[in-house]
Amino acid sequence: MWAERHRAAVELQQFLSSVYEQVKKEESLGPFQFKDDIQVHVVCDGHCKPLESFCSGSEVLYILEKKPLTLEDNVLDETENNEGISFYTSLQEIPQPQAIPTMRARQFLTSYTLTHNPNMVQLNSGAPVKVLPPLWVRCDCSDAEGTCWLGAEPIKSSRNEITGMSFRTVTCAGPTADKSTFPSLDSLRQAHKERHYSSVMQTRGFAQYDLFGCNTVENSVIESQSSVTVDFVWNGVERILQLPPLASAATLNIKVESGDLRSPVYSVYKELDFLLVLAEGLKTGVTEWPETGETKSAVDLVQLLLNDLKNKVDGLTSSVSKKDNEKIKSDTAAVDCSIQSFITERGDLDFAEMLWCRMRKSVSSYQDVVNCFSLVIQSLKNGEVHPWIHRGSSSALSKLIQQSYHGKMQSVSLTGLTPMRMLLEIGLDKMKKDYISCFIGQDLATFNYLDYFISSSVDIQEQVQRVKKLHHMLEVVVVCNAFLSLGHENLFPLTQSCLKYYKENPWNEQHVFQLPIRPSVISTFYQNSHPQTWRVEIISGHGQKEVKTTWQLTSRRPVDHVSFAVPDVPIDMTISGENEEIVYYPTQVSCSQVNFC
């Protein structure tokens, strides 16, 4: 029996070592098959969500699980059409993580532990023990305790020598809304004391609240693709489900995706969206023109703009500008009824920017763009208009306007991609100035901080990407301002964090921005709500001798490889509200240590 155990331990050690080397060399990301029905993943800490609350912070770890079954069968559909022809359909089951029996999982951890024991010289032929990343095994809750994870991690000395092994056992019960079934904090402390013979213990609390889910605000910017949660951490837990004290350390987690119809900056998003259509068309040669809501054609709108400029030259009073200004105010008011818009319409639009505003809402074809620019260039050549433009504008049209001041204009061939590029350029110029006006106007950034994002010295496609980053930053700040009513003292560091991230990383709307915040600032959003996650850690010992017992409640299933029977929930029972109940999954993580010497 011992020989068989030793052989199994060596086999597992060799397999895990081989897998780790392949991952380090980036030869494969797995999963790696071990035996017929077992596979292993190598993941970075934080990339396996079900383990986020249980891991100790290792950079890399193994996850061992049962190989999932994939079914792909041809199924005869008995239904026949009018001609009597049978149809065949193919069904493929999406693989889900699979657990192994708890007893077998313990055997794998035994093998893993044996190979790390420096006293087992017969397993390593006298060679130094090779330290492997921690091993976690998915369990099927088949034991009486309901074990869903088993983990093992080597304990190393300051000289990087293995001195023992740390084990973690994660148990989980099915969902319940009956708080009377929860253990008391005293009983958890007593169990920890008896398990670890500890006389001195400290407690640390953690709670996470969903700030979008716990309140309903009419016409707010709440959107399912976006989320704002807050994490609280505090010492000295007093009871189970304790409300985080105001002295807690709190951190906002903000993930925002653009395109929410209720966002105060939705009109800006639509403008950016058209800019992206042009950029894609310039790159591929194919443009997917959006539908226009204008009753007048693009050429008619541009002609009206030119006539307005001519009338100004002739000293006539313009009615067009008044109507446009009224429409701008009306549009701004329509964006948001109950939340004051964070961004205001600029009043210093130059000719190129006004041209962009009309063309982006009305052009529906390549020929529209050509015809509009033909009108403008002809009016400039004939000296019919003398429009003003902002200093520093870098678009081709701005350069033509500057040349028209001196009566000498270069000829422009409105063929190929030239008209598309000209339109994209004036759109980029306009939107850059919009974002500058917003961030500097709200005293959230200086021009020097924004210079990277508005630079015209890079390729035009890169300019578009940087403008996308500016818009995402604006969406993040607006959500916190409009929905959470955060003031400048919080919006300023949030903006700086966004600027720093996007100077170093590509555009990514899945990124979660974090902002430390005083609990009192957001207390009205969570104090009458239920936490998504609530956790208490009971800790004793120090350094490598530290042991911890964790007891946690989550509103979502804590593991993805075990199914739980969901209890019948009354119709009026929801997950938020002052006097409403919530269904929780209780989970406990126990720790133990074994010394090798």
Swiss-Prot record:
It is found in: Chromosome, Centromere, Kinetochore. It comes from the Eukaryota. One of its GO terms (cellular component) is RZZ complex. GO terms for biological process: cell division; mitotic spindle assembly checkpoint signaling; protein localization to kinetochore. The keyword Cell division applies. InterPro entries: Zwilch. Signal peptide: none annotated. The keyword Electron transport does not apply. Keywords: Cell cycle, Cell division, Centromere, Chromosome, Kinetochore, Mitosis. Pfam families: Zwilch (PF09817). Component of the RZZ complex composed of kntc1/rod, zw10 and zwilch. Essential component of the mitotic checkpoint, which prevents cells from prematurely exiting mitosis. Required for the assembly of the dynein-dynactin and mad1-mad2 complexes onto kinetochores. Belongs to the ZWILCH family. This is Protein zwilch homolog. It comes from Xenopus laevis (African clawed frog). The lineage of its organism: Eukaryota, Metazoa, Chordata, Craniata, Vertebrata.
